[in-house]
Amino acid sequence: MEINVIVKPPFKKLVSAQFLKKIASETLKAQAADPSSELGIVITGQEEIKELNCKYRQLDEPTDVLSFYMLEENPENLTAPDDFPTPPDEATHLGEVIISYPQAELQAGAAGHSVNHELAFLLIHGVLHLLGYDHHETAAEAVMKSHQDIAMKHIREILE
């Protein structure tokens, strides 16, 4: 699995790229994702995530995490869209997970846990979206929450 991490300059001393790679890798393994998959992770600030949220979700406000798919959304049939061919010898790019560090920090404080715990939760949430899980309907939300809970238990030792 190839996991590329970009931590924007204001947050470089606050976030470990290795930590994020480990969380993403463990989440993908637990979900039996294709080992040749690749994923991008970006840690950014409120302004950039607000711009992305406005542009792609028409919500003019910051958010905690955004996921941008490169695959079809059905977790039982993860394939690249027809207009995005993947050569047989190349990794399948799942997509990008963008996380707002300031929002993660706020949420961690409100929840009474560490920023790393919140970053892990948001990253798991974003990766699950890339794998096709969603929470717009009650049944789908229950399935996604179950996978999030399992992943958080799985990475508990990384957080300690």
From Swiss-Prot:
Signal peptide (UniProt feature, chain positions): none
Compartmental location: Cytoplasm
Keywords: Cytoplasm, Endonuclease, Hydrolase, Metal-binding, Nuclease, Ribosome biogenesis, rRNA processing, Zinc
Entry's cofactor comment: Binds 1 zinc ion.
Essential cofactor(s): Zn(2+)
One Gene Ontology MF term: RNA endonuclease activity
Annotated Zn(2+) binding sites: 125, 129, 135
First-tier enzyme category under EC: hydrolase
EC number assigned by the record: 3.1.-.-
UniProt keyword Nuclease present: yes
Keyword Glycoprotein assigned: no
Domain of life: Bacteria
Gene Ontology BP, a term: rRNA processing
CC terms in the record's Gene Ontology section: cytoplasm
PROSITE patterns for the chain: UPF0054
Predominant place of localization: cytoplasm
UniProt-listed Pfam families: YbeY (PF02130)
Role, per record: Single strand-specific metallo-endoribonuclease involved in late-stage 70S ribosome quality control and in maturation of the 3' terminus of the 16S rRNA.
Family: Belongs to the endoribonuclease YbeY family.
Protein's UniProt name: Endoribonuclease YbeY
Organism from which the protein derives: Dehalococcoides mccartyi (strain ATCC BAA-2100 / JCM 16839 / KCTC 5957 / BAV1)
